[in-house]
Amino acid sequence: MKTIFFFITFIVLVSSCTSNIMTKSISQVKSQFFSPALSPNVDPADEHIGHSPDDMKIIFCQQCAFHCIEKKKNIGNCENSICRCTLEDIL
């Protein structure tokens, strides 16, 4: 009876340690996957290079044109981040 008790206790301790080790290794793998380390030669400020103002105007005017087309209107004006569609319907 004592042998069975010690054997079960030993199995519980081993499984507990194994569980803790597996949890730590999985969390380390996940943290490496979601936040990869930057190489020392890369400036973090250069990671996300934004669009130039001209690019942003082109993108805005494209979105404006799509908006007007969805309303079945012609694009009237696209300046200073203001989108205006014509009153006439597209033929």
From Swiss-Prot:
BP GO annotations: defense response to fungus; killing of cells of another organism
Keyword Secreted: yes
Broad class of the protein's primary localization: secreted
Classification lineage: Eukaryota, Viridiplantae, Streptophyta, Embryophyta, Tracheophyta
GO cellular component, one term: extracellular region
Cellular location(s): Secreted
Name of the protein in its database record: Defensin-like protein 220
Signal peptide: 1-19
Keywords: Antimicrobial, Disulfide bond, Fungicide, Plant defense, Secreted, Signal
Sequence intervals crossing the membrane: none
Disulfide bonds: 61-78, 64-83, 68-85
UniProt keyword annotation of Mitochondrion present: no
Domain of life: Eukaryota
Residue stretches in coiled coil: none
Protein family per UniProt: Belongs to the DEFL family.
